[in-house]
Swiss-Prot record:
It is an enzyme of class 3 (hydrolase). It comes from Rickettsia akari (strain Hartford). This is RNA pyrophosphohydrolase. Its cofactor is a divalent metal cation. The keyword Hydrolase applies. GO terms for cellular component: cytoplasm. One of its GO terms (biological process) is mRNA catabolic process. Belongs to the Nudix hydrolase family. RppH subfamily. Keywords: Hydrolase. Residues 12-154 form the Nudix hydrolase domain.
Amino acid sequence: MRNSSKKHLDLPYRLGVGMMILNADNHIFVGKRIDTKLSAWQMPQGGIVPGETPSIAAMREMLEEIGSDKGYIIAESKCWYSYDVPSLLIPKLWNGNFRGQKQRWFLIRFTGNNEDININTSNPEFDQWRWASLDELLSIIIPFKRKLYQAVVKEFKSLIQ
């Protein structure tokens, strides 16, 4: 076990983006992951394609994950945030090449309506979605991402209220 832990720590982080998508009521889009039986809710996120800027990646990922790009960027995080996935998940994610993700986060105002959202995309990541209040967000998020989400909420909170 010690060797696998060391191996885990030697792996790099995958570069990506995360999106805190707000509706008109300042509720946040969360989706329930399709690839687990756990109640794993999260905000949309994804990788950065080589040559792509983080802001372009965020809008592309928004379209890929919620089926709509109706929105605009309010703010970009001041730093990169990272999280490690549990070591048991590493072989199942990203071909086992990464220990977790290092992400630039974006606060996005969704300008569409609920009917514009379609999670049944060509490569769906969610089987359910809903709008969550800022107060409930941290309680429903998958635990290994909670510390990152706390930091993102702290950075963007003054822009939401």
